[in-house]
Amino acid sequence: GGDFDIYRGDAFQLVVAQPQHSIAAAVGLRLALKAHASGVDVRMSVAVGEAQFRPSEVKTGTGDAFVLSGRGLDNIKPHHLTFCSGEQTLDDKTQLLTRFADSHINGLTQTQSQTLLAYLEATDKSHESVAAILDKNRSNVSRILNASNYKLIAEYLDYMERALILWVQGGTSLKTEQLTKED
């Protein structure tokens, strides 16, 4: 869940209640826009930190999250997605990964964006299930997902979620071992 404000007709601010879901929300929103129409995209600066706001007036919010997000937006070009926590250790481990993910998402087609979004949102991640959701055949969905490098994006989102869970828990010195996924 979250709160949002739209202003100036072409800008918005979104507050995600659980910081660990902020990157997934941003990537999902980007994919949804790219899936909606060819050539449509958005620039987003994701930041986590303290925030004070009234739910009906997100645009008047204050705190680290708003300041960091604003700074990120000021410096976002030529990128479309940035991330900042204000914690050097976390930022060192996540900003480069975010730029790679951003670069990859930039190159996705409308169909790849639609299919990748359906995969990421699906409870059942099987290609058959995603194909049923999209009313496409499984082999076509598999081909599109592979071309969109879906596993890499899913792994990036998992990594960011784990990193932000540790951040929320007060992990000020994040270690690589803490962020490595255990199979």
Model features per residue range: what roles?
Residues S126-D135, V141:
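Short alpha-helical "recognition helix" segments of helix-turn-helix
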